[in-house]
């Protein structure tokens, strides 16, 4: 099936849907300028997520070479600060407004789905702009740009980059006064909202797998769960189809290119034009 036909078929499927769900990965955020682990020459080539992705590794790296780690972190902050929702994000909001999309299940922590307007977002890896109390487990969300500005200011005024100094710069809980940490999943930690994600997959009539390779489990099982429950599975990824076993329609394009075209055709189909 060529790309034009695949886009038309995807539009026909979505035009008849009322409970579609999205499963999005790093490829969607990459189109907003946020590098993936695979991007050559990016920050992750110098900041190995396998070394700093868990709590113990992060602490060890801070002890060993704090200046390098903080410099890389500041670079990442600049990347997240500059990112904006791309046409793919905005197309998903269009699908929600049309009553087609019921949930976005995402592995991304950048808050861009919410900023584009989607209201039902299930974050399996957490949110980088939300903090969780280490004691009472309460959560507090922050506006992305304001939080990045405060973090950069605090880091620039620290007496040193020791773990104690850095963690002392974290916000305190409004409820109990204890320390807080970013509400994200580190390597080795339990993925969040698994039950909600799989429930959304089981209840959807169409599953859109966007910009994800289907490698990381248990999240990678979500499209298969949707397929087993009777949903059509549409995969949009320019690099590979990691869900070939369950895929009904594959579109080898970037989501920011494919989704606006699909949504445009959905509108025409629904209007009868």
Curated annotation (Swiss-Prot):
Q: MF terms per GO, please?
A: histone deacetylase activity, NAD-dependent; metal ion binding; NAD+ binding
Cystines in this chain: none
List the catalytic residues: 125
Report the EC number(s), separated by commas if there are several. Answer: 2.3.1.286
Any idea which positions bind NAD(+)? 25-44, 107-110, 211-213, 237-239, 255
Reaction it catalyzes: N(6)-acetyl-L-lysyl-[protein] + NAD(+) + H2O = 2''-O-acetyl-ADP-D-ribose + nicotinamide + L-lysyl-[protein]
Keywords noted in UniProt: Cytoplasm, Metal-binding, NAD, Transferase, Zinc
The record's listing under SUPFAM superfamilies reads:
DHS-like NAD/FAD-binding domain
Domain Deacetylase sirtuin-type, residue spans: 1-269
Name any one Pfam family assigned in the record.
SIR2
**InterPro entries from the xrefs?**
DHS-like_NAD/FAD-binding_dom (IPR029035), NAD-dep_sirtuin_deacylases (IPR050134), Sirtuin (IPR003000), Sirtuin_cat_small_dom_sf (IPR026591), Ssirtuin_cat_dom (IPR026590)
Gene3D superfamilies noted in UniProt:
SIR2/SIRT2 'Small Domain, TPP-binding domain
> Mainly resides where?
cytoplasm
Give the protein's cofactors.
Zn(2+)
**So where does Zn(2+) get bound?**
133, 136, 173, 176
NCBIfam families reported in the protein's UniProt record: PRK00481.1-3
Family recorded in the similarity comment: Belongs to the sirtuin family. Class III subfamily.
PANTHER family in UniProt: NAD-DEPENDENT PROTEIN DEACYLASE SIRTUIN-5, MITOCHONDRIAL-RELATED
Protein function: NAD-dependent protein deacetylase which modulates the activities of several proteins which are inactive in their acetylated form.
Q: What is this protein called?
A: NAD-dependent protein deacylase
Organism of provenance = Desulfosudis oleivorans (strain DSM 6200 / JCM 39069 / Hxd3)
Which gene specifies this protein's sequence?
cobB
């Amino acid at each position: 099936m060529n790309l034009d036909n695949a886009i038309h078929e995807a539009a026909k499927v979505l035009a008849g849907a009322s409970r579609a769900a999205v499963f999005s990965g790093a490829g969607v955020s990459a189109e907003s300028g946020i590098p993936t682990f695979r991007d050559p020459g990016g920050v992750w080539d110098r900041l190995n997520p396998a070394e700093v992705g868990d709590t113990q590794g992060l602490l060890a790296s801070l002890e060993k070479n704090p200046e390098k780690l903080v410099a890389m972190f500041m670079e990442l902050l600049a990347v997240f600060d500059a990112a904006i929702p791309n046409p793919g994000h905005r197309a998903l909001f269009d699908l929600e407004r049309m009553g087609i999309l019921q949930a976005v299940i995402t592995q991304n922590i950048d808050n861009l789905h919410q900023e584009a307007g989607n209201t039902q977002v299930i974050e399996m890896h957490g949110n980088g702009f939300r903090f969780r109390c280490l004691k009472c487990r309460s959560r507090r969300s922050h506006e992305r740009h304001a939080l990045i500005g405060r973090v950069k200011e605090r880091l620039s005024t620290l007496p040193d980059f020791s773990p104690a100094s850095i963690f002392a710069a974290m916000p305190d809980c409004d409820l109990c006064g204890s320390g807080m940490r970013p509400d994200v999943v580190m390597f080795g930690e339990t993925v969040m909202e698994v039950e909600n994600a799989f429930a959304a997959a089981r209840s959807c009539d169409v599953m859109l797998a966007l910009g994800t390779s289907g490698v990381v489990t248990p999240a990678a099982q979500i499209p298969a769960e949707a397929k087993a429950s009777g949903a059509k599975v549409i995969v949009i990824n320019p690099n590979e189809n990691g869900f070939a076993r369950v895929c009904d329609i594959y579109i080898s394009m970037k989501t920011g290119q494919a989704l606006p075209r699909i949504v445009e055709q959905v509108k025409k189909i629904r209007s009868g034009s």
